[in-house]
Each structure stands twice: as C-alpha cells, then as structure tokens.
C-alpha cells in the first residue's frame, strides 16, 4: 500500500516515532551472540511491542559487540514491531568505517566524526520508555513457534499454551504447537532438523562465517541433513574465500553458494519441503515463509 502511495504522490505518510531505550547490561557468555540478544528482546517485548517506536540499544553488552553484531541486533528490530533500531556511534563505529570504500577520506574524517558525535543521544536524554535486559545469564535462544517472539533458551522447557493467561498468546501458541508438533515441557534440544541454513541479511556477515567455520573445523554434517552456506553479499563471499572459509564449509558437507536471499524466502529451488525442519540463521519463521506450508523453521 505504501509503495502505491509513494508512486502516486511522491510522498509517504509518517508519524513521529517514540524512542524506547533498551539497556543490555552485563556481558555475553561463551556461545551466546548478538542474535540471542535480539531474540531475547523480542521474547520479552513481543512481536508488536515496538509498534510506534524506534529502539535505541545501549548498555555494556551492546558496547562490547563488534559492529557486525550490532548490525544483527538492529536488523531484527522490525521483527519486534519497531520502525527502526540503532546504536549510538562510538569508536567501534569509527574503526569499522575508516578506510572503507565509501567512507570519508582522511582529509574530511575528523569533520565527519565531529558530526557523528553531535548526533549521539545526550547523556541526560529523556526517552519515552526504558527497558532493561540482563546479558549475564543469557543462554543461546531458539524459536519454538511460528513467529520470532515465540522463543526459549535452547535448554528451557517450551511453554504450555494452556498455562498462558493471555487469550491471544494462548491461541497463537496452540497454533504453533500444532504446526511444530510439540508437547508441553519438551525442550528444543534434540529437535531433529533436515536442513541447516547459514546466511541472510541477519547472519550472513564475515564474522558469522568465521565463527561458524571455527565451530565446523574437523566436524561433518550428518548425511541426512542438507546444509547451505549463503553469504549475505558478494563482498562477504569474496572475503570468506580469501580467508579459505569456503573450504572449511565444503569439507564439512555444506554447499557453498553465491550471495543471495536463498532459503530466507524460498528463493528458486532453495525451498523447505513438507514436513521438513530447518535450522535457520534468518529472521522470520512464519508458516510458508521458507517453502511448503507444512515445513517448519527454527530460528537461531
């Protein structure tokens, strides 16, 4: 609808958004990543919790993330209903940008840094809402249902729909249980998968492939699992290949692909079959999103 209006008028109707500050305190433990942070936030606030808001992410755990981790968090703000998400610029931002192809040249660099510093939120800024998340006890998070807010820690029991007080949540959980074939009290550990997919705009960056390759080194994909690695851009693909990461994936049994959206939205032949389960680094697990309506997606 908005595309139609823009083409017809050259304008878009937009309202001023509220700003919600999300402070992620503490530090992430081993095996816990930026994706786990944003899945936890969506679990706590809901898939509609950010409607009418922009999310500002801060706190110790966010400051400790590298730039690509911050990008992963901001990327999924929309999955929580927010119009946008951002992290205030700091030295991590500037180090990431400096020397890149489209970054300001050395003669203009200091001028741009001064400008970026000027648009940071003030130390005494007032927000429409402030939410706190504790990263110290955060575990790897996975979705158990059919939207990005139906999330649990990987070793945490899946919630019982009948124990939910909210009628809307209860109905949504019942639908998810039927689709995902769950039983109350089970965990996602041991939930068999048929397909493993690493890539997309959420987790298709160089740092993602470096970390996955580190874990894969010396291991092999099960013969019954179809595994794909799809870099998020051609730049990422060439960087991975320059470091030899593609060979690690191939030797482990992954298909190494050119950049693209691939299984995120069942592009071309990269489609989930009926009854298949996919472990996916993407951002959406809606019914039919990745292929057959009877396929099941687990985000992680």
Name what the model sees in each region.
Residues 1-300:
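Fe-S-dependent hydro-lyases/dehydratases of central metabolism
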């Amino acid at each position: 609808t908005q595309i139609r209006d823009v083409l017809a008028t050259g304008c878009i109707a937009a309202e001023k958004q509220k700003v919600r500050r999300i402070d992620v305190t503490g530090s992430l433990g081993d095996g816990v990543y930026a994706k786990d942070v944003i899945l936890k936030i969506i679990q706590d606030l809901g898939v509609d919790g950010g409607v009418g808001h922009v999310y500002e992410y801060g706190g110790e755990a966010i400051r400790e993330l590298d730039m690509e981790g911050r990008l992963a968090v901001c990327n999924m703000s929309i999955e929580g209903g927010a119009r946008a998400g951002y992290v205030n610029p700091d030295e991590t931002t500037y180090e990431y940008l400096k020397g890149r192809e489209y970054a300001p040249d050395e003669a203009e660099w200091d001028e741009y840094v001064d400008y970026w510093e000027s648009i940071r939120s003030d130390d005494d800024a007032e927000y429409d809402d402030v939410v706190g998340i504790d990263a110290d006890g955060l575990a790897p998070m996975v979705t158990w249902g059919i939207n990005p807010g139906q999330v649990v820690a990987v070793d945490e029991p899946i919630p019982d729909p009948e124990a939910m007080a909210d009628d809307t949540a209860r109905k949504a959980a019942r639908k998810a249980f039927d689709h995902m074939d769950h039983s109350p009290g089970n965990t996602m550990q041991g939930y068999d998968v048929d397909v493993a997919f690493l890539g997309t705009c959420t987790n298709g960056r160089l740092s993602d492939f470096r970390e996955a390759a580190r874990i894969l080194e010396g291991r092999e994909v099960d013969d019954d699992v179809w595994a794909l690695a799809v870099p998020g851009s051609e730049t990422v693909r060439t960087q991975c290949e320059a470091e030899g990461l593609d060979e690690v994936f191939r030797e482990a049994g992954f298909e190494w692909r050119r950049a693209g959206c691939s299984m995120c939205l069942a592009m071309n032949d990269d489609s989930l079959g009926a009854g298949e389960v996919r472990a996916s680094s993407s951002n959406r697990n809606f019914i039919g999103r990745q292929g057959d309506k009877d396929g099941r997606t687990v985000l992680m």
